[in-house]
């Protein structure tokens, strides 16, 4: 695996993209730990997935810098290869589909993102018990896609439902809960509910200041969101 990780990091460097080595390591480690496909396919699936994860992670960071369509097409080709090699219903297949949906969101392909996350939500309902992390992540992707399509009321309903479900399993200041609250505040602002959005941003500001510190970027974004909504 060390040899493959060196290949992954070399590919990222060659692509000239900036990515987080921690993100790569966590993704690869989780993929290796949780793979449950047939033993006969384990070797080639893990090799393909590890190499393609590096390429995908690299391209995703490129998308965030607005280099959208070139990288988006590269991701699609890479993910088709991975998904064909992964046994259906396995953790690697779910992980690859999540990355594909994320790439669609970043590239502005919201209809395709909604399709892939809707399929994922259905496929992962019974994967690890009710309200499992895979299912809630897919629901969150659906909400983001609907928000991108301007379907703010539907997105807000999804986000509020996700927050209730995550609150059953996670501490109140968990970053996933805070991120969901921030997106819900944004949806309210887009719907013209400025007062409710400002209240939510203020609550987020207090939570983030306590959890991350007063000068943390997320804390400052929450404060800026509250001030903007109050204008």
Language-model regions, residue ranges each:
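Intrinsic-disorder-linked linear interaction elements in eukaryotic regulatory proteins
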Residues: 1-231
